[in-house]
Amino acid sequence: MISGDTLVTDKIIELSDGADVVLHDAMALQLVQGAETLSRRSGNTRLATVLHDIQDYHATTADLARLADEADIGLLALYHLVPAPRNAMAIAAFNGDLPDGAVITEDGMVILLPANSDEIMVD
């Protein structure tokens, strides 16, 4: 199941249930809220507004953890990360709430589902 620019809703959970792989956008809420606050304080109201508005249509890592808990998913793979993590500390902000086995995708990553197998391979 592939989802993009959406919150985790009951319908997303329903559609994800039983999926081998769920690819979902993800937002590190604490980073976005921090950037929003700093933008507002520095007078950059346009950026602050954008950072506020994107919270309405990106799934938080806590909500994605709930998705993984409530739906039977083989692999939760996150893409379209907001904000795009540029270092290990930012990646850690995404990993904090995620269940074991969740994957933060990278450009060029391949997820393979071999025929006649339950195996999910990430390369």
Range-by-range predicted roles:
Residues 1-17, 110-123:
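Core dinuclear metal-dependent hydrolase active-site scaffold
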Residues 7-108:
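Cap/insert and terminal regions of metallo-dependent hydrolase folds
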